[in-house]
Amino acid sequence: MKSDMKNSWTGWFFMALILLSGCTNTPKQEAMYATTPHTNQRLPRNLPKKMFGIALQLPADFNSYKQGEHFLWLSNNDTEVVENIALYSIKENAISALNVPRFCHLRDSVMHKNVRGISDAIYMTTLQASVRGWKDNTTSTFWFEGLWEMQNDAMGGRFICRAIKRPSRHDILFAEAILYAPKTENKTILMRQLQTVLQSIK
Protein backbone atom coordinates (compact mmCIF):
# COMPACT_ATOMS: atom_id res chain seq x y z
CA MET A 1 0.00 0.00 0.00
CA LYS A 2 1.32 3.41 -0.92
CA SER A 3 0.43 4.86 2.45
CA ASP A 4 2.68 2.39 4.24
CA MET A 5 5.84 2.34 2.14
CA LYS A 6 8.66 0.95 4.27
CA ASN A 7 11.65 1.80 2.12
CA SER A 8 14.06 4.06 3.95
CA TRP A 9 15.31 5.44 0.65
CA THR A 10 11.77 6.50 -0.15
CA GLY A 11 11.67 8.41 3.13
CA TRP A 12 14.82 10.31 2.23
CA PHE A 13 13.53 10.95 -1.27
CA PHE A 14 10.29 12.33 0.13
CA MET A 15 12.27 14.71 2.27
CA ALA A 16 14.31 15.88 -0.68
CA LEU A 17 11.30 16.40 -2.90
CA ILE A 18 8.63 17.75 -0.62
CA LEU A 19 10.07 19.32 2.46
CA LEU A 20 11.71 22.60 2.89
CA SER A 21 14.79 23.98 1.30
CA GLY A 22 15.36 25.49 4.74
CA CYS A 23 16.36 22.04 5.94
CA THR A 24 19.52 22.06 3.84
CA ASN A 25 21.10 24.55 1.52
CA THR A 26 22.26 22.34 -1.33
CA PRO A 27 21.95 23.73 -4.89
CA LYS A 28 20.03 20.58 -5.88
CA GLN A 29 17.25 21.30 -3.41
CA GLU A 30 17.17 24.92 -4.43
CA ALA A 31 16.35 23.77 -7.96
CA MET A 32 13.62 21.47 -6.67
CA TYR A 33 11.76 24.37 -5.11
CA ALA A 34 12.13 26.81 -7.96
CA THR A 35 8.39 26.60 -8.65
CA THR A 36 7.29 27.50 -5.12
CA PRO A 37 8.21 30.17 -2.56
CA HIS A 38 10.64 28.93 0.04
CA THR A 39 13.04 30.08 2.71
CA ASN A 40 16.28 28.90 4.23
CA GLN A 41 15.65 30.57 7.58
CA ARG A 42 14.44 29.05 10.83
CA LEU A 43 10.77 29.35 11.62
CA PRO A 44 9.79 32.66 13.25
CA ARG A 45 7.38 31.62 16.00
CA ASN A 46 5.09 34.57 15.25
CA LEU A 47 4.69 33.67 11.56
CA PRO A 48 1.34 31.83 11.94
CA LYS A 49 -0.06 34.86 13.75
CA LYS A 50 1.34 37.25 11.17
CA MET A 51 -0.09 35.29 8.25
CA PHE A 52 -3.36 33.97 9.69
CA GLY A 53 -3.98 35.80 12.96
CA ILE A 54 -3.65 32.65 15.06
CA ALA A 55 -1.49 31.23 17.81
CA LEU A 56 -0.72 27.54 18.13
CA GLN A 57 1.51 25.40 20.30
CA LEU A 58 4.11 23.86 18.02
CA PRO A 59 6.51 21.15 19.18
CA ALA A 60 10.00 22.48 19.84
CA ASP A 61 11.50 20.55 16.92
CA PHE A 62 9.30 22.28 14.33
CA ASN A 63 11.91 24.64 12.91
CA SER A 64 11.56 24.34 9.12
CA TYR A 65 8.99 26.09 6.99
CA LYS A 66 7.88 26.98 3.49
CA GLN A 67 5.71 30.01 2.84
CA GLY A 68 3.35 30.51 -0.08
CA GLU A 69 0.32 32.63 -0.90
CA HIS A 70 -2.12 32.10 1.99
CA PHE A 71 -0.16 28.91 2.70
CA LEU A 72 2.36 27.89 5.35
CA TRP A 73 4.09 24.51 5.67
CA LEU A 74 5.80 23.72 8.99
CA SER A 75 7.94 20.64 9.61
CA ASN A 76 10.16 18.87 12.11
CA ASN A 77 12.32 17.74 9.16
CA ASP A 78 13.06 14.41 10.84
CA THR A 79 14.69 11.57 8.90
CA GLU A 80 12.46 8.79 10.29
CA VAL A 81 9.16 10.31 11.42
CA VAL A 82 8.30 13.35 9.31
CA GLU A 83 5.65 15.47 11.02
CA ASN A 84 4.18 18.46 9.21
CA ILE A 85 1.57 21.12 9.82
CA ALA A 86 0.01 22.89 6.84
CA LEU A 87 -1.98 26.10 7.27
CA TYR A 88 -4.00 27.69 4.49
CA SER A 89 -7.07 29.90 4.18
CA ILE A 90 -9.80 30.20 1.57
CA LYS A 91 -12.40 32.95 1.31
CA GLU A 92 -15.71 31.75 2.71
CA ASN A 93 -17.76 32.99 -0.24
CA ALA A 94 -15.84 30.53 -2.44
CA ILE A 95 -17.21 27.60 -0.44
CA SER A 96 -20.89 26.74 -0.74
CA ALA A 97 -20.79 23.55 1.34
CA LEU A 98 -18.00 21.93 3.30
CA ASN A 99 -18.55 18.22 2.74
CA VAL A 100 -16.01 15.50 1.98
CA PRO A 101 -16.02 15.87 -1.84
CA ARG A 102 -15.77 19.65 -1.62
CA PHE A 103 -13.03 19.49 0.98
CA CYS A 104 -10.99 17.04 -1.11
CA HIS A 105 -11.34 19.28 -4.16
CA LEU A 106 -10.20 22.35 -2.22
CA ARG A 107 -7.35 20.47 -0.57
CA ASP A 108 -6.11 19.02 -3.84
CA SER A 109 -6.08 22.44 -5.50
CA VAL A 110 -4.00 23.91 -2.65
CA MET A 111 -1.57 20.99 -2.41
CA HIS A 112 -1.13 20.77 -6.18
CA LYS A 113 0.07 24.35 -6.13
CA ASN A 114 2.23 24.23 -3.00
CA VAL A 115 3.48 20.67 -2.41
CA ARG A 116 5.25 19.34 -5.48
CA GLY A 117 8.10 17.01 -6.27
CA ILE A 118 11.03 17.33 -8.59
CA SER A 119 8.66 17.85 -11.52
CA ASP A 120 5.17 19.32 -11.87
CA ALA A 121 3.85 15.79 -12.49
CA ILE A 122 4.59 14.86 -8.86
CA TYR A 123 2.32 16.51 -6.29
CA MET A 124 0.33 15.74 -3.16
CA THR A 125 -3.23 14.53 -3.61
CA THR A 126 -6.05 13.18 -1.43
CA LEU A 127 -7.48 9.65 -1.50
CA GLN A 128 -11.11 10.73 -1.30
CA ALA A 129 -12.44 7.22 -0.62
CA SER A 130 -10.44 7.18 2.63
CA VAL A 131 -11.67 10.54 3.93
CA ARG A 132 -14.30 10.94 6.61
CA GLY A 133 -15.58 14.22 7.98
CA TRP A 134 -17.54 15.42 10.98
CA LYS A 135 -18.62 18.68 12.60
CA ASP A 136 -17.85 19.83 16.11
CA ASN A 137 -21.31 20.94 17.22
CA THR A 138 -19.93 23.23 19.93
CA THR A 139 -17.88 25.35 17.52
CA SER A 140 -17.78 26.39 13.88
CA THR A 141 -15.24 23.66 13.25
CA PHE A 142 -15.18 20.77 10.81
CA TRP A 143 -12.75 17.85 10.95
CA PHE A 144 -11.55 15.64 8.11
CA GLU A 145 -9.12 12.75 8.21
CA GLY A 146 -7.86 10.28 5.66
CA LEU A 147 -4.91 9.34 3.47
CA TRP A 148 -2.71 11.37 1.16
CA GLU A 149 -0.32 10.25 -1.54
CA MET A 150 2.10 11.72 -4.03
CA GLN A 151 0.66 11.56 -7.52
CA ASN A 152 3.00 9.67 -9.86
CA ASP A 153 5.19 8.51 -6.99
CA ALA A 154 5.07 5.80 -4.32
CA MET A 155 4.75 7.88 -1.17
CA GLY A 156 1.85 8.51 1.15
CA GLY A 157 0.56 8.66 4.68
CA ARG A 158 -2.15 9.93 6.99
CA PHE A 159 -3.53 13.39 7.62
CA ILE A 160 -6.11 15.12 9.78
CA CYS A 161 -7.51 18.57 9.10
CA ARG A 162 -9.32 21.10 11.24
CA ALA A 163 -11.39 23.59 9.23
CA ILE A 164 -12.42 26.71 11.15
CA LYS A 165 -15.01 29.15 9.85
CA ARG A 166 -13.98 32.70 10.74
CA PRO A 167 -16.81 35.16 10.02
CA SER A 168 -14.73 38.14 11.18
CA ARG A 169 -12.20 37.38 8.44
CA HIS A 170 -14.74 36.06 5.94
CA ASP A 171 -12.65 32.95 5.39
CA ILE A 172 -12.12 29.36 6.44
CA LEU A 173 -8.80 28.43 7.99
CA PHE A 174 -7.57 24.91 7.26
CA ALA A 175 -5.00 23.48 9.64
CA GLU A 176 -3.63 20.06 8.74
CA ALA A 177 -1.37 17.55 10.42
CA ILE A 178 0.39 15.47 7.76
CA LEU A 179 2.43 12.42 8.72
CA TYR A 180 5.02 10.42 6.81
CA ALA A 181 6.35 7.57 8.94
CA PRO A 182 6.80 4.43 6.81
CA LYS A 183 8.77 2.56 9.49
CA THR A 184 6.25 3.20 12.29
CA GLU A 185 3.68 0.43 12.77
CA ASN A 186 1.26 2.31 15.05
CA LYS A 187 0.71 5.75 13.60
CA THR A 188 -2.39 6.50 15.68
CA ILE A 189 -0.43 7.84 18.64
CA LEU A 190 1.59 10.13 16.39
CA MET A 191 -1.55 11.43 14.71
CA ARG A 192 -3.25 12.13 18.03
CA GLN A 193 -0.20 14.07 19.20
CA LEU A 194 -0.34 16.16 16.04
CA GLN A 195 -4.07 16.63 16.48
CA THR A 196 -3.43 18.35 19.81
CA VAL A 197 -1.40 20.95 17.90
CA LEU A 198 -4.44 21.67 15.74
CA GLN A 199 -6.65 21.84 18.84
CA SER A 200 -4.34 24.43 20.38
CA ILE A 201 -5.17 27.00 17.69
CA LYS A 202 -6.58 30.21 19.13
Specify the residue positions occupied by each region the protein language model found:
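Short aromatic-glycine motifs in intrinsically disordered, low-complexity regions
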Residues: 42-55, 189
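Glycine-rich, often proline-containing surface loops adjacent to acidic residues and nearby aromatics
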Residues: 83-84, 140-143, 170-177
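Secretory pathway targeting signatures of secreted, lumenal, and periplasmic proteins
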Residues: 59-116
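Terminus-proximal functional modules
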Residues: 21-40, 48-50, 69, 109, ...
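Oxidative protein folding and maturation machinery
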Residues: 1, 21-28, 60-61, 68-73, ...
